[in-house]
Amino acid sequence: MELTPREKDKLLLFTAALVAERRLARGLKLNYPESVALISAFIMEGARDGKSVASLMEDGRHVLTRDRVMEGVPEMIPDIQVEATFPDGSKLVTVHNPIV
């Protein structure tokens, strides 16, 4: 199977998000990379489902809360930008203050 670099990046991100979901399910708090991966995968999957950029910008702020991540992580992530594939093409989705 031949994958482009972008496709490899998407698979790596999705794999990291799966690890993050499993750790949350075990009651562990997420670190910086896990938090970014989980929110980014949420945005990418929402885009694939046909949600709007505006709704993903808002919904992306409710994926994680402070009590689900390690201390200091919310301050390390002022915003997350994801180039996601929507039914009508690729668009940049920015989520400001993603962990409240």
From Swiss-Prot:
The gene is ureA. It catalyses: urea + 2 H2O + H(+) = hydrogencarbonate + 2 NH4(+). It comes from Citrobacter koseri (strain ATCC BAA-895 / CDC 4225-83 / SGSC4696). Belongs to the urease gamma subunit family. GO terms for cellular component: cytoplasm. GO terms for molecular function: nickel cation binding; urease activity. Transmembrane segments: none annotated. The lineage of its organism: Bacteria, Pseudomonadati, Pseudomonadota, Gammaproteobacteria, Enterobacterales. Its main location: cytoplasm. This is Urease subunit gamma. It is found in: Cytoplasm. InterPro entries: Urease_gamma, Urease_gamma/gamma-beta_su, Urease_gamma_sf, Urease_subunit. Pathway: Nitrogen metabolism; urea degradation; CO(2) and NH(3) from urea (urease route): step 1/1.
